[in-house]
Regions:
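Conserved functional loop/turn residues at catalytic and ligand-binding sites
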Residues: 45, 53, 144
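Single conserved hydrophobic/aromatic residue that forms the stacking wall/gate
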Residues: 1-6, 10-11
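Generic hydrophobic alpha-helical scaffold/packing signal
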Residues: 7, 21-23, 38-42, 50, ...
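Conserved strand-turn element in the central/C-terminal portion of the radical SAM core barrel
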Residues: 14-33, 52-70
Length: 161
C-alpha cells in the first residue's frame, strides 16, 4: 500500500520528493521479498535513499533466526538496489536543473570559494559563496545535476539592499 500512496502523492503534488532507508538481507528475507522491495522502489521513485546490508547484532532476536541470508547474496542485492536508487536520484536531480530553490547554507564546500547546503528536497547543493552565509537561506538556481549533488548559482541574497 505504501507504494500506491507514495506514488499518488508525488503525482498529485510535484513538490513532494520521496526519500527512504533500505536494509537488504535481513534474516529470513527471500528472493520474493527482495523482488517486492525493487517493485516498491520502481513504483514510488525516490529522490534520495540510503541502503545498507543487514548485519546481525549479537543478543538480538534477528541474530538467532536460522534463515540468515548469505553475505554474497546481501552484496548482490545491495548492488542491484543501489543501481536502481542511483538512477532514480540522478533522474530527480536532472529534472530539477534550472529550478530556483531556497538553499540552507550548511558549511564551507570542498573547493576554494565554494559553499554547501541543502535544497528543500534535501539535495546537496554546491555554489560559490562565503562563510558569512552559513546558517542563511539563499535562493539558488540549480545549474547542473550530479549523481549525489547539484551545482547552483546564487541569484540574489534575501534581505540584501
Amino acid at each position: 500500500q505504501f507504494g500506491l500512496v507514495g506514488s499518488e502523492m508525488c503525482i498529485r503534488d510535484r513538490d513532494i520528493a520521496m526519500s527512504g532507508d533500505f536494509i537488504v538481507g535481513f534474516s529470513g528475507e527471500t528472493d520474493r521479498d527482495f523482488a517486492e522491495t525493487l517493485q516498491l522502489v520502481n513504483q514510488v521513485g525516490y529522490a534520495s535513499a540510503y541502503s545498507f546490508k543487514y548485519s546481525p547484532r549479537p543478543g538480538t532476536p534477528a541474530a538467532t533466526i536460522e534463515q540468515q541470508v548469505p553475505e554474497h547474496v546481501k552484496a548482490e542485492r545491495l548492488e542491484s538496489l543501489q543501481q536502481l536508487l542511483n538512477a532514480q536520484q540522478f533522474a530527480f536531480n536532472k529534472a530539477t536543473e534550472g529550478q530556483i530553490v531556497d538553499v540552507l547554507v550548511e558549511r564551507i564546500g570542498g573547493r576554494a570559494g565554494q559553499m554547501a547546503g541543502r535544497s528543500p528536497y534535501m539535495q546537496a547543493v554546491n555554489f560559490v559563496g562565503d562563510q558569512s552565509q552559513i546558517g542563511q537561506i539563499v535562493p539558488c538556481k540549480l545549474s547542473a545535476a550530479r549523481q549525489n549533488s547539484m551545482s547552483g548559482e546564487i541569484i540574489a541574497i534575501k534581505g540584501a539592499a
